[in-house]
Amino acid sequence: MSAGNGTPWGSAVGEEAWAGSGVAVEGSELPTFSTAAKVRVGVTIVLFVSSAGGNLAVLWSVTRPQPSQLRPSPVRTLFAHLAAADLLVTFVVMPLDATWNITVQWLAGDIACRTLMFLKLMAMYSAAFLPVVIGLDRQAAVLNPLGSRSGVRKLLGAAWGLSFLLALPQLFLFHTVHRAGPVPFTQCVTKGSFKARWQETTYNLFTFCCLFLLPLIAMAICYSRIVLSVSSPQTRKGSHAPAGEFALRRSFDNRPRVCLRALRLALLILLTFILCWTPYYLLGLWYWFSPTMLTEVPPSLSHILFLFGLLNAPLDPLLYGAFTFGCRRGHQELSIDSSKEGSGRMLQQEIHALRQQEVQKTVTSRSAGETKGISITSI
């Protein structure tokens, strides 16, 4: 078995580092750089290149100034932060995982062990919390389209703040453990940080809930409320509104095409999050409650599932690129429709003005004839 990470936050490395097939040392076996680990490293490098390029492009696209906007829209701000979270996963989690599988043991020292485990979990938290913020923003945009969007920055600050605070225990749980023998071995583990097995299981379950279960429930609630609101009969009724309200609503009805694309993008991000990480977290749950499964499940399966989870970071910029292309087409169609509508209005106004001129001429000629008749009669 390779040395790598038992879970996305690496808290099960202690057991994995000393178990499995490898080099026998004093009656036990140490991990080796197996063929499965080599494939994992190769795929991780491909994911790193694609994720770094895609998310850097998204970050540049959403942060560059727009001529038509004084400041970035809330949607662009949200996806800028999501790209930053994906880049944190790209530049911390992926290189750490690849390097650790190559070196097998930990060679960077105790301080780097604690710091990198902290940054790794913070990256995972931010990548899980920011889709929740996007879901809350989409919910507010649909349920209260005329409301203020000033709360987006507070939600973003809360997401990053929670990511930092919840990852802090990693600084105290992880440390380096040295093993003497014919083949000296050092590993970055949580071994000895928990007095009992149930304490480590509780910490893992808490991290699992914060990383996966709670964000999933929050996003499911947000999008369920959106679907119920959009499909409700009151939302479909627009003809019974007063004229002024109808005109205001019509001005917003041109925007929902873009809002709908943003909603679809957010839903796709939720689906990719579920599809990419659910299998691996289920495997982690199985391991926490049945540690003996580590010797029953082939190492290649854990490698595949973890790589499938890392696929989430490269997919986000592809989804955003499709969203941006759709928005540009939508804006072009909207501008064409607006120009056609404006031309039609101008034509109607000209016809109405000509008709008024004809009516005025007719009235003037009639009044002139009546005046002439009266003057002749009087003579």
From Swiss-Prot:
One GO MF term attached to the UniProt entry = peptide binding
Entry's localization field:
Cell membrane
Q: Topological domains (Cytoplasmic): residue ranges?
A: 61-76, 137-160, 225-278, 324-379
- Outline which residue ranges sit on the Extracellular face: 1-40, 97-114, 179-204, 298-303
Alphabetized UniProt keyword annotations: Cell membrane, Disulfide bond, G-protein coupled receptor, Glycoprotein, Membrane, Phosphoprotein, Receptor, Transducer, Transmembrane, Transmembrane helix
- Keyword Ligase present in the record's keywords: the answer is no
User: Where, by residue number, does the polypeptide cross the bilayer?
Assistant: 41-60, 77-96, 115-136, 161-178, 205-224, 279-297, 304-323
Enumerate the glycosylated residues. Answer: N101
Protein's GO biological process: cellular response to hormone stimulus
Q: How is it modified after translation?
A: Phosphorylated on the C-terminal cytoplasmic tail.
Per the record, membrane topology reads: Multi-pass membrane protein
Q: Which Pfam families match?
A: 7tm_1
Disulfide bridge map: C113-C188
Q: Which GO terms describe its cellular component?
A: plasma membrane
State if Transmembrane is listed as a keyword.
yes
What family is it from? Belongs to the G-protein coupled receptor 1 family.
What is the documented function of this protein? Answer: Receptor for gonadotropin releasing hormone II (GnRH II). This receptor mediates its action by association with G proteins that activate a phosphatidylinositol-calcium second messenger system.
Q: Mind telling me what this protein is named?
A: Gonadotropin-releasing hormone II receptor
**What gene codes for this chain?**
GNRHR2
